[in-house]
Regions:
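Class I SAM-dependent methyltransferase "Motif I" SAM/SAH-binding loop
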Residues: 41-43
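A short glycine-rich, Lys/Arg-flanked "PGG" loop and its adjoining helix->strand segment in the class I
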Residues: 119-131
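A conserved beta-strand element that flanks and buttresses the S-adenosyl-L-methionine
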Residues: 105
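Class I SAM-dependent methyltransferase SAM/SAH-binding core
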Residues: 46, 50-92
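Acceptor-substrate binding/catalytic loop of class I
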Residues: 113, 179-193
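Conserved class I S-adenosyl-L-methionine
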Residues: 136-165
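Conserved S-adenosyl-L-methionine
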Residues: 205-215
Length: 235
């Protein structure tokens, strides 16, 4: 498959037509579930459609209804009965019954949330997961070429013990990347320690957390191999 990146309609970056490594773990897990799974920030279905094909019932969430309309059109007709569309911005606009989900997938969406929103969001995801359920998270870190100038600031905040060392109020103040208009003004670049803390406070157990370079990441984003952070946790 030829890799393509497509800008999101709501200017929250880009979506890929190739699942990243964390998303591949979610898709593989979807083959074994009996309860529905949730895909937060589903965009055009790079995770949702393969999870449907794996046999799962998928609640596809996105803050842009146009994304969900496109996702539904792209879903093969035989799989559409397994698809439930869930419009709204996480973690504010929708709720799901407690302990009803086998898995939650959130790839390249949590780094647009404030610290308070992350705290609320992890509490919700933990509540929604059934016993034995899995959480799959992928997010951007400060270690990306467009944000290289921010790394010393971030590392100083880490050393000072700040709770949210990767919070960037205005991305235009730390980067001159030519496509900054495709992302929100504020970003929350995440790391292993912050995700570990959020998971623990939500009452989940960490199975694995690691930094890596996604195979679908453009060369213009490459810095030192720690451009992304992945997390798998369980109830």
């Amino acid at each position: 498959m030829i890799h393509r990146r497509q800008p999101t309609r709501n200017r929250t970056g880009w979506t890929s037509n190739v699942p990243n490594e964390l998303t591949q773990c979610f898709i593989a897990y979807s083959k074994s579930v009996s309860r529905p799974v949730l895909d937060i920030g589903a965009a055009f279905g790079v995770a949702t459609i393969p999870a449907l094909a794996a046999g799962a019932t998928v609640l596809a969430n996105d803050s842009d209804p146009g994304h969900l309309a496109s996702l539904e059109e792209l879903t093969p007709p035989l799989l559409r009965p397994q698809l439930q569309l869930l419009p709204g911005r996480f973690p504010h606009d929708f709720d799901i019954p407690a302990q009803s989900l086998a898995a939650v997938h959130a790839s390249n969406v949590l780094h647009f949330l404030t610290g308070d929103e992350l705290m609320a969001g992890f509490q919700l995801m933990a509540r929604w997961l059934a016993p034995g359920g899995r959480l799959f998270v992928q997010a951007g870190t400060p270690y990306q070429q467009p944000f290289a100038a921010f790394v010393p600031v971030y590392e100083a905040r880490v050393a000072a013990g700040e709770l949210w060392p990767g919070w960037v109020e205005d991305a235009r103040a730390i980067s001159t990347h030519r496509k900054l208009n495709q992302i929100p003004r504020s970003l929350h670049l995440l790391d292993e320690a912050v995700l570990n803390r959020l998971v623990t406070l939500a009452g989940l157990q960490v199975e694995r957390v690691w930094t890596y370079r996604r195979h679908d990441l453009p060369r213009s984003m490459h810095l030192d191999g720690r451009e992304g952070v992945g997390l798998i946790a369980y109830t």
